Amino acid sequence: MKVRAAALGLAAIFSGLQTAAHAADDPLKVCLDEDRPPFSAHHRGKPGTGFDLTLAQAIADRMGRPLKIQWFESKLDEDSSPQLEANALLSDGRCSLVGGYALTRDSLVVPGVKTARLPDFEGATRDDRRRRIDIGVLTPSQPYVYSPLTVVLGPKARGRTINNIGDLSGLRLAIESGTLGDAILMSFEKGRLIDNITHLVPGRDDLLGALERGDHDATLLDLARFDAYRAAHHDTGLSASGYYYPIGANRGYVALAGESALLVAVNTALADLQAEGKIAGFARQAGLTYLQPREPTIIGDVWEKIIQR
């Protein structure tokens, strides 16, 4: 009896070792947006690039696992939801982590629906585009970068000192309709700037191009977007004001709620990479202005905060 028990014990240990070894061989599957430079970018026939890709590789290396990227295309229409897109990708097993995810309370709430459609992704079939996926609940990692909005100045306003939104008074402002920047500028001091604001349509009008031509003097947009523009236009006449709007979002990974062990490993790797200064280095390499995560880790109702200000 003792011999049989010992044999069973050894079998269990051996089985556990096999499972652990198999897990180490399994690729770490991470979903990244194919069109969000300098965070992540991938075009057919070319290797992927970006801060999030380099960071994901470093985390996989720390975990002793190969990395597999599932590229996806986030929709720009009004009905799209980054939360549901990420949830569908995770729930369908396309990846275990979604990178570059904005950590807001609204983006992490329990979904109000039970199913969601997948975004378009590399390798998707016609059936994939039709399917609805039973979705779960998202859980975040610790953040690894802070993403603020910044004021970008056109050639005619170059050198203007901007310390707050009020300093935009008198400038010809351009903003994309329906964005956070739109809400901030339109609601500032009960509409003080409204008469100087021109609204452009996201995805149709070229906001930064119009600013470059001198059609407008300034705009308010995501800092990373301006980083990407500068990388693609080395001779740009646009300039960074150095002013960051005080409400921004940390970015991190999200996984499904049942992936606690994975998130512990990811958080350990992130903490080590942060302490070694590697994350800031990855950002410099990608041309991303790096700002360390800030408290609160998960921001509350962004719209409410803007209105209150």
Q: What is each of the regions a protein language model found here?
A:
Residues 91, 99-130, 184-188, 212-247:
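A ligand-binding cleft/hinge motif common to bilobed small-molecule-binding domains
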Residues 24-109, 200:
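Extracytoplasmic small-molecule ligand-binding "clamshell" domains
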